[in-house]
Amino acid sequence: MPKNKGKGGKNRRRGKNENENEKRELTYAEEGQMYAQVTKMLGNGRIEAACFDGVKRLGHIRGKLRKKVWINQGDIILLSLREFQDEKGDVILKYTADEARTLKNQGELPETAKINETDTFGAEGEDDLDFEFDVDAI
């Protein structure tokens, strides 16, 4: 078999698709859509999101965003509500921190919305536990 003498494979030749510096047009919520903040990552393309109407909903990351747009806890997202299931929705868009601040300044998001903070809704069942070990007792 031939030896690998190159400097990488076909992924290196393709190059990275860097479009971070492009400004995109701000998308506002329409009928049947709601702004939400991610409270928990559930895995398998699902999230728990606290909508700004006070309801916690289960969100499904749609295929267009999956593995392309990384969604983290505390991010502001646009959730499309399902007509037949009120407690579930689909993630349409993830807002950057700058876009979320713009939405907050324009009054689209409530003033209580915390932007770019990971611990958004307090520790649910997570307490700071300190353990002390006695080496002499062992």
Swiss-Prot record:
Q: Which domain of life is it from?
A: Eukaryota
- What one GO molecular function would you report for this record? RNA strand annealing activity
Kindly indicate whether the keyword Protein biosynthesis belongs to this entry. Answer: yes
Domain S1-like: start-end pairs: 22-96
Q: Does the keyword Protein biosynthesis apply?
A: yes
Biased composition regions of type Basic and acidic residues, renumbered to the chain: 16-27
Region of interest (Disordered), ranges: 1-28
Q: List the disulfide bonds.
A: none
Pfam families per the UniProt record, alphabetical: eIF-1a
Positions with biased composition (Basic residues): 1-15
Q: Which UniProt keywords apply?
A: Initiation factor, Protein biosynthesis
**Record-level GO BP terms:** cytoplasmic translational initiation; translational initiation
- Which PROSITE patterns does UniProt cross-reference here? IF1A, S1_IF1_TYPE
Give GO cellular component annotations, separated by semicolons. Answer: cytoplasm; cytosol
Entries under Gene3D superfamilies matching the protein:
Nucleic acid-binding proteins (2.40.50.140)
HAMAP family for the chain: aIF_1A
Family, according to the entry, reads as follows:
Belongs to the eIF-1A family.
Per the entry, what this protein does is: Seems to be required for maximal rate of protein biosynthesis. Enhances ribosome dissociation into subunits and stabilizes the binding of the initiator Met-tRNA(I) to 40 S ribosomal subunits.
PANTHER family in the record: EIF-1A
- This protein is called Eukaryotic translation initiation factor 1A
Its source organism is Schizosaccharomyces pombe (strain 972 / ATCC 24843)
